[in-house]
Regions:
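Soluble, non-transmembrane catalytic domains of enzymes that act on hydrophobic metabolites at membranes
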Residues: 1-12, 17-19, 26-27, 137, ...
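C-lobe/activation-segment region of protein kinase-like
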Residues: 177-238
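A short, local hydrophobic-aromatic micro-motif
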Residues: 92-95, 166, 206
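Alpha-helix N-cap and loop-to-helix initiation/capping positions
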Residues: 69-72, 138, 200
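Conserved kinase catalytic-core helix
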Residues: 83, 87-90, 119-161, 165-166
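Short glycine/proline- and charge-enriched loop/turn segments
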Residues: 59-64, 128-133, 200-206
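Active-site acidic catalytic loop and adjacent metal/ATP-binding pocket
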Residues: 40-46, 52-54, 148-193
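Conserved ATP-binding subdomain of kinase catalytic cores across diverse folds
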Residues: 18-122, 151, 155
Length: 238
């Protein structure tokens, strides 16, 4: 006698899009109008209990020589998340991404990512006394982790393009001698490929220097770790 197996119903991408589109949560980034459209981010608990973030966009596009008529920016962010994940750069886990035109032929687009459990903005970590609590050895390891993630990104010719300190998140796992710092990069909407790794590195690191509060000593440590991971010196980072 054959064994009958109950198959899970197949859900189309269009049905998943509609499901995520109708879900509502807490606004963590209120909808704002730019790029000729609207974009905002909500946080909510999915049906499986997972904390997720949904970026919801209407008519929010960018143009390039490949896409002269406009393309939803979440598709560029999806490409970056997938590309950086493949390079072992710590970024949010992609759950779903989709874009479709509505009846008026305007773009609707979604990007759904899993929350980075336990991660906080690095400046909030500093403000809460994380450096003092865990000590300088762990802080050096944090800088080393940040440098490694950035170097792997740039060696793949990816440029973050909006590398402000508020987009660097940190988590410490364990206590005492067993404590370990982990770093993640967020807000990849403007991330793009460059012709050379050096061009990507120079742009992002100069931008991070301008938009961070690292002391001169900490910055020099970060640059040292970065150049060791990148494999060569980058001029003009002092």
């Amino acid at each position: 006698m054959g064994v009958q197996v109950a198959m899970e119903p197949t859900i189309s991408k269009e049905e998943r899009f509609d499901s995520f589109w109708t879900q509502r949560g807490e606004w963590v980034e209120e909808p704002n109008r730019r790029r000729g459209g609207e974009s905002g981010v909500q946080r909510l608990i999915a049906d499986d209990g997972q904390l997720i973030y949904i970026k919801r966009q209407v008519g929010h596009t960018y143009r390039s020589w490949l896409h002269p008529f406009g393309r939803p920016t979440v598709l560029r962010e999806r490409d970056a998340i997938q590309g950086l994940s493949g390079l072992d750069v710590n970024v949010p886990k992609l759950i779903f991404c989709g874009a479709q035109r509505d009846k008026s032929h305007e773009w609707r687009a979604l990007l759904v990512t899993a929350a980075l459990d336990g991660f906080v903005e690095i400046e909030d970590w500093y403000a809460a006394g994380g450096r003092e609590h865990h000590g300088e050895a762990l802080h050096d390891q944090l800088l080393h982790e940040l440098a490694g993630n950035l170097a792997r990104m740039h060696k793949g010719r990816w440029q973050h393009s909006c590398l402000y300190i508020k987009h660097v998140f940190v988590r410490v796992v364990g206590e005492g001698d067993n404590a370990k710092a982990e770093v993640a990069l967020l807000d990849l909407e403007k991330c793009r490929r460059r012709l050379t790794a050096v061009a990507a590195a120079r742009h992002d690191l100069k931008q991070l220097r301008r938009h961070s509060s690292f002391t001169s000593t900490d910055w020099q440590k970060l640059v040292y770790f970065y150049q060791a991971a990148f494999g060569s010196a980058i001029k003009g980072l002092d």
